[in-house]
């Protein structure tokens, strides 16, 4: 059935078909990666007309849908499932509102949801406020179903997809991926399968993003099995939208962690320069993956990721991560190590805490969190004459003159009662050590001795 909405859609689409074919032939990829100085949010949405890595002989299948017909969603999902393909579905907000069961089925099958505006207007004719309204109303429809597009957008009619103003408006709202396409099969015009397959043969390129339409009057659904078979006959495999916007070491790491099914979830940005040449970062729903030449790619997420970002991420004293977030041997906490000799440790009781430098080295020599000090409960702070970090079982003090030394137990209690580093004892110059009948710690201004029989702590001069 042809409706007025179908006619409007076809009129708008006709303007973009020739451009789509040209892009496929010339090999346009995406807008240049937007440099995010010091790991900052992108200033403009990245536009993907092909996958981020155009080398592999793979393609991504996507389908668009508006409100006027639901399309044969069960059949499309069955075809994709039978072929092991994860596709992208760009849906308008009014489609989501009218056909919630179909949208839930698409999401439950693991396919990528993409915000296609609320009611399919041309975006270059809208003000910033009107664009925001289109995005918000559509996303609200997804959220009422407990779903999200995670900041992915596809421009209706392909209108303004390369426009700097549109891209800036998207980025200002956290919609950092504009997921475009390489070529349109034109099944929405009701063309025979032979026409669709001819376009597949002519315009498919490595990394290509194939656009089809889900509407009931589109011939794409009927042609879908033949499209898949034709692509495979041409030597192409299939990737999914999630991995198609990643590349290189970050892409491999994301895939190795489980891609969208991992703690990272959906990609939120394209790969960006993290600080300078030879560095990269990509943001995801649940965290970020950083890469630096010679260090490799590592993820940071959750409370540790939030703390890392709050410290200044890779421009902070920590630098780049050199591990993924890793569980501690006792199973209680988690940690990331970083390139400049620092770590962030987290437990439910302590939160995410920073430990670094000579204090970290002392803590490590004493067994990390498995030693008597346990987990850090505070960050390193300045004290009289030096620096200190507090742990569950004691404290470590440092100065350039004295080095790093621990103080714990009853001796620490007496030390703090006498003013700690600000008192007459000053900074420690030894760890606690065994003496006849007890234990002792030495300080710049004297010593403290614990009696193993009485439990008393006495003090003396140097």
Tell where the protein language model's regions lie, with residue ranges.
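Extended, compositionally biased repeat/scaffold regions that form elongated interaction surfaces
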Residues: 244-462
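Active-site beta->alpha N-cap acidic-glycine motif
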Residues: 39-150, 218
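Residue-level "edge-of-site" marker
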Residues: 93, 119, 155, 183-184, ...
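Structural recognition of the beta-strand scaffold that forms the well-ordered cores
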Residues: 59-62, 87-91, 112-117, 150-154, ...
């Amino acid at each position: 059935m042809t409706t007025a909405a179908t006619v409007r859609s076809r009129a708008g689409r006709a303007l973009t078909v020739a451009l789509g074919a040209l892009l496929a032939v010339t090999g346009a990829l995406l807008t240049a990666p937007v440099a995010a100085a010091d790991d900052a949010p992108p200033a403009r949405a990245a536009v993907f007309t092909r996958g981020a890595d155009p080398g592999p002989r793979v393609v991504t299948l996507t389908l668009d849908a508006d409100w006027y017909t639901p399309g044969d969603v069960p059949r499309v999902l069955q075809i994709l499932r039978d072929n092991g393909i994860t596709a992208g579905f760009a849906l308008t907000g009014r489609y989501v509102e009218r056909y919630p069961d179909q949208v839930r089925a698409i999401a439950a099958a693991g396919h990528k949801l993409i915000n296609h505006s609320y009611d399919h207007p041309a975006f270059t004719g809208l003000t910033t406020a009107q664009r925001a309204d289109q995005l918000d109303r559509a996303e609200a429809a997804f959220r009422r179903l407990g779903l999200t597009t995670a900041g992915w957008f596809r421009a209706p009619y392909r209108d303004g997809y390369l426009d700097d103003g549109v891209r800036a408006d998207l980025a200002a709202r956290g919609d950092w991926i504009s997921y475009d396409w390489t070529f349109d099969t034109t099944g929405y015009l009701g063309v025979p399968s032979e026409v669709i397959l001819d376009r597949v043969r002519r315009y498919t390129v490595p990394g290509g993003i194939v656009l089809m339409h889900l509407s009931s009057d589109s011939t794409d659904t009927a042609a879908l099995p033949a499209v898949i078979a034709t692509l495979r006959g041409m030597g192409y495999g299939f990737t999914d939208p999630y991995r198609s916007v990643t590349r290189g070491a970050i892409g491999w790491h994301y895939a190795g962690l489980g891609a969208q099914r991992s703690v990272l979830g959906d990609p939120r940005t394209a790969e960006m320069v993290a600080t300078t040449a030879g560095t990269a970062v990509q943001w995801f729903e649940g965290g970020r993956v950083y890469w630096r030449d010679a260090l490799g790619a590592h993820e940071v997420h959750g409370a540790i990721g939030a703390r890392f970002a709050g410290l200044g991420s890779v421009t902070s004293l920590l630098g780049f991560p050199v591990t993924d977030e890793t569980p501690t041997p006792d199973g209680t906490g988690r940690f990331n190590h970083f390139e400049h000799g620092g770590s962030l440790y987290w437990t439910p009781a302590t939160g995410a805490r920073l430990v670094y430098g000579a204090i970290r080295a002392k803590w490590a020599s004493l067994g990390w969190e498995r030693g008597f000090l346990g987990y850090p409960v505070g960050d390193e702070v300045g004290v009289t004459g030096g620096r200190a970090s507090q742990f569950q079982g004691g404290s470590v003090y440092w100065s350039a003159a004295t080095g790093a030394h621990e103080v714990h137990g009853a001796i620490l209690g007496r030390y703090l009662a006498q003013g700690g580093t600000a008192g007459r004892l000053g900074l420690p110059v030894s760890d606690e050590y065994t003496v006849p009948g007890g234990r002792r710690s030495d300080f710049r201004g004297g010593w403290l001795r614990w009696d193993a029989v009485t439990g008393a702590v006495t003090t003396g001069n140097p």
